[in-house]
């Protein structure tokens, strides 16, 4: 049965947002107009972001036995989103030819969605340790050895429509500012690639 992760904070890191819009990691000079828009759009984003996360923990025998789950005692599956409102607002800016504002708001949305995923990752790692199991790093469909087609399996497990998240024909999530991932729970710590534990 799927459960919700409650009280998800919205975290927005200016450096990561600036990197997403094309600035180097340690820019010496940032255009004043960019900084002004960043402040304005962060305020706007806080009104638009609706952070949600659903998860379910399955025994290995309940999974589809994909090789990425090898050696896991259990596997946690998670779906995170910030909702559709920010994306709609950003698209509106692009349609109005306000490209920089649209780009900045879109980057803020990406940072916010990843922030929800980081919060969920930590919550699920803590849950693993409560079960006396060892969590892996999170892994998402389409990365490394987990094909994008596995997105369907995640959506079979989790009631994504409760959060307003769907898959299109290309297996991309709508709203786009959504993140899905799996996390293996191991009985033996030797199998985990995670460097630190809560």
PLM ranges: what are they?
Residues 82, 131-198:
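Short terminal or interdomain "cap/linker" segment that borders an active site or interface and mediates
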Residues 17, 45, 90-91, 104, ...:
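Generic structural signal of hydrophobic/aromatic residues within well-ordered alpha-helices
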Residues 60-63, 67, 100, 130, ...:
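Charge-rich, low-complexity amphipathic helices
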Residues 1-101:
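Active-site helix-to-loop segments that bind/position phosphate- or nucleotide-bearing substrates
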Residues 43-51, 125, 129, 159:
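Generic secondary-structure signature for well-ordered alpha-helical cores
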Residues 37, 41-45, 116, 120, ...:
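General structural feature for long, well-ordered alpha-helical segments within catalytic domains
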Residues 69-141:
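Conserved mixed alpha/beta catalytic, RNA-binding, or beta-rich assembly cores of soluble enzyme
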Residues 30-37, 105-108, 112, 116, ...:
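Catalytic cores of large soluble enzymes that bind and process phosphate-bearing ligands
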């Amino acid at each position: 049965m799927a459960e919700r992760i409650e009280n998800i904070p919205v975290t927005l890191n200016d450096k990561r947002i600036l990197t997403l819009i094309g600035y180097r990691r340690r820019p010496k000079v940032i255009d004043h107009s960019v900084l002004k828009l960043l402040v304005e759009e962060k305020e706007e984003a806080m009104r638009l972001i609706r952070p949600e996360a659903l998860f379910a923990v399955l025994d290995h025998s309940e999974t589809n036995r994909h090789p990425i789950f090898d050696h896991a005692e259990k596997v946690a599956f998670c779906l995170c989103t910030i909702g559709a409102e920010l994306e709609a607002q950003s698209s509106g800016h692009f349609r109005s030819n306000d490209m920089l504002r649209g780009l900045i708001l879109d980057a803020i949305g990406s940072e916010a969605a990843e922030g929800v995923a980081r919060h969920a990752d930590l919550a699920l790692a803590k849950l693993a340790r409560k079960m006396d199991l060892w969590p892996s790093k999170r892994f998402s469909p389409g990365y490394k050895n987990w094909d994008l087609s596995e997105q369907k399996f995640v959506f079979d497990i989790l009631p994504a429509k409760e959060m307003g998240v769907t898959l299109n024909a290309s297996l991309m999530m709508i709203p786009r500012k959504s993140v899905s991932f799996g996390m293996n729970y191991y009985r033996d710590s030797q199998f985990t690639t995670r460097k630190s534990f809560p």
